[in-house]
């Protein structure tokens, strides 16, 4: 199953060993970033580093080596631009980098196999999800220390905070519920059941009672009115009212939706449905499916720019393009042959996409207006994802 791939640590030529001591970012000595919005961050799993590429020049301005056998999964910059963080899936540690100096300033033990993460809006709290540990590690960014481990989850993936920072919502890929965390107490206070497994489960036990493809993320709408959580096994999107923390509507989408992605104008959202190779376009005003369109296999992400949606089909080598005004297909972009596309970020001007391509260790830059592609090679070994501060399309597998 492709979703198993999404949750599997990428293989590669990794050196055995423990995480190196502080100072492993020595190759970045003397490099300074005065404007945190000026760079694309690239997480390289097999070279165990975070690379920084200047958006204007497309030149590497620095790399921070994290240590041997780290296998970083996702990279994110704090909202205040002060720090860059990542979780080392094989190291069971969180790594904190000073943005201005590109120095690794702290390594903090987490629970098992840290992957996805998020910052509170005020940059105070760094929540690190640990899918194999069924927990969230809470890191205080003032003291740069782990202050708590929140237990009780089921393969937690993505974390989203309310704009006021009062609550965090945790997608549980191994269950059909979204966890609600009281950020003041750092406690799991509620489980929002997206839907019940239907009574026909006994008739199709492989689908309903086998490996669960649950909730990847509870994604807020741009206006913050609702949260949307796609359940892969059940093929639905649950609409959550955060004022009451309950599901107010179910939207039937395609088979095995991976997650939901929000358009920037607040009109539509998209679920890539890997079970039937379609996308569902959801009208956020009516909370209903406005269109179901053919797509590609093994979709890993959706980005929005220039009135279009760009849907990444990981193993086909294509990015599928859709006109978000007419809600119709607008072609596809061939990125290469026998390549593996990962995930992308969109620049803050919504002009270009920066797509990680792991086979040839490069970043592919897509011009959103013309669909032209530019390649930047030698970014690191097995680039897994990209991140730009303040982008509306920062996500991971």
Named regions from a protein language model:
Residues 1-5:
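N-terminal secretory signal peptides that target proteins for export/translocation
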Residues 7, 12-397:
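Predominantly soluble domains enriched in secretory-pathway, periplasmic, or organellar proteins
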């Amino acid at each position: 199953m492709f979703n198993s791939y999404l949750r599997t640590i990428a293989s590669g030529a990794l050196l055995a060993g423990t995480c190196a001591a502080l100072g492993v970012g020595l190759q970045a000595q003397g490099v300074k970033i005065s404007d945190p919005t000026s760079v694309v961050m690239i997480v390289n799993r097999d070279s165990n580093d975070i690379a920084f590429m200047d958006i204007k020049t497309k030149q590497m301005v620095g790399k921070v080596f994290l240590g041997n056998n780290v296998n970083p999964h996702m990279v994110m910059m704090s909202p205040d631009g002060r720090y860059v963080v990542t979780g080392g899936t094989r190291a069971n540690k969180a790594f904190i980098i000073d943005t201005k100096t590109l120095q690794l300033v702290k390594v903090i033990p987490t629970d098992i196999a840290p992957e996805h993460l998020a910052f509170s809006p005020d940059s105070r709290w760094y929540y690190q999800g640990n899918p194999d540990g069924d927990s969230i590690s809470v890191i205080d960014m003032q003291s740069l220390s782990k202050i708590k481990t929140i237990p009780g989850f089921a393969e937690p993936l993505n974390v989203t905070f309310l704009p006021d920072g009062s609550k965090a919502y945790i997608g549980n890929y191994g269950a059909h519920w979204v966890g609600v965390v009281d950020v003041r107490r750092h406690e799991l206070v509620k489980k929002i059941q997206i839907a019940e497994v239907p009574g026909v489960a006994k008739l199709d036990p492989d689908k309903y009672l086998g490996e669960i493809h649950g909730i990847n993320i509870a994604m807020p709408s741009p206006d913050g009115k609702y949260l949307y959580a796609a359940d892969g096994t059940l093929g639905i999107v649950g609409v959550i009212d955060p004022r009451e923390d309950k599901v107010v509507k179910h939207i039937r989408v395609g088979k095995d939706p991976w997650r939901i992605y929000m358009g920037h104008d607040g009109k539509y959202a998209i679920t890539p449905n890997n079970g039937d190779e379609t996308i569902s376009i959801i009208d956020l005003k009516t909370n209903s499916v406005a269109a179901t369109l053919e797509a590609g296999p093994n979709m890993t992400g959706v980005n929005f720019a220039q009135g279009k949606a760009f849907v990444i089909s990981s193993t086909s080598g294509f990015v599928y393009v859709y006109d978000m005004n007419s809600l119709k297909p607008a072609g596809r972009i061939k990125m290469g042959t026998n390549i593996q596309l990962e995930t992308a970020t969109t620049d803050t001007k919504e002009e270009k996409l920066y797509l990680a391509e792991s086979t040839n260790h490069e970043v592919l830059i897509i011009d959103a207006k013309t669909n032209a592609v530019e390649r930047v090679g030698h970014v690191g070994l097995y680039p897994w994802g990209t991140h730009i501060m303040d982008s509306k399309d920062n996500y991971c597998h």
